[in-house]
Amino acid sequence: MKRFVSVVALSGVVSLAGCVAPTPKPNDPYYAPVLPRTPLPSAANNGSIYQAGFEQNLYSDRKAFRVGDIITITLNERTQASKNANSQVAKNSKTGIGLTSLFGGSATTNNPLGGNDLSLDVGYSGDRATKGDSKAAQGNTLTGSITVTVADVLPNGIIAVRGEKWMTLNTGDELVRIAGLVRADDIATDNTVSSTRVADARITYSGTGSFADASQPGWFDRFFLSPLFPF
């Protein structure tokens, strides 16, 4: 019996541990800054004043378009979602069967115990009703800026960017991460682009420390809020 209780307790602890969100850690290699690729040195051509690999476009600007370039993304995220649902189902049914005769005789007989006569009449009635109402609302706002690096340039000119920002405060750390795809045409002349123009964006805002821990329910509360709770 004690062994069974120990197994059940251990299973509960393991299940609750699976409900805990992983704590973000710094220095994730995926979000590490990407350094520009060093061009291979070309053979010097002493017979010409123009050397390959050192040319510059007279009509180009300083907008980021190469691996390792820096882009500042302004965070302008705002989402509002709401949903209402209600349902009501009702059903009434009634059935009655009246027998006046049975095998040629009367279907009603005297009650030997007294009272009303006994009858073979059958009656049934039933009512069923179901009613449900649900409402959900959620809103999020994220503003600010984060500077990231160009991680790759796709063959069609789309720029893949990603990066992170860690801010160490007195009570913990704050983290902002972003990764996505940007069109070169959407980048302003000061190398800024709005987060609303980032395709396939992956934006993370999280933190560690006492403030972040205070917003999380305890392990005992998480059990009652988990799908394992039967009620």
Swiss-Prot record:
Disulfide bridge map: none
GO cellular component labels: bacterial-type flagellum basal body, distal rod, L ring; cell outer membrane
Residues bearing a lipid moiety (S-diacylglycerol cysteine): 19
Localization of this protein: Cell outer membrane; Bacterial flagellum basal body
Gene Ontology terms for molecular function: cytoskeletal motor activity
Topology in membrane: Lipid-anchor
Keyword Secreted: no
Residues linked to a lipid group, N-palmitoyl cysteine type: 19
InterPro entries, sorted: Flag_Lring (IPR000527)
UniProt KW keywords: Bacterial flagellum, Cell outer membrane, Lipoprotein, Membrane, Palmitate, Signal
GO BP: bacterial-type flagellum-dependent cell motility
Top-level division of the source organism's lineage: Bacteria
Signal peptide: 1-18
Similarity comment: Belongs to the FlgH family.
UniProt-listed HAMAP family: FlgH
NCBIfam families registered for this protein in UniProt: PRK00249.1-4
Record note on quaternary structure: The basal body constitutes a major portion of the flagellar organelle and consists of four rings (L,P,S, and M) mounted on a central rod.
Function summary: Assembles around the rod to form the L-ring and probably protects the motor/basal body from shearing forces during rotation.
Protein name in the entry: Flagellar L-ring protein
Source organism: Pseudomonas fluorescens (strain Pf0-1)
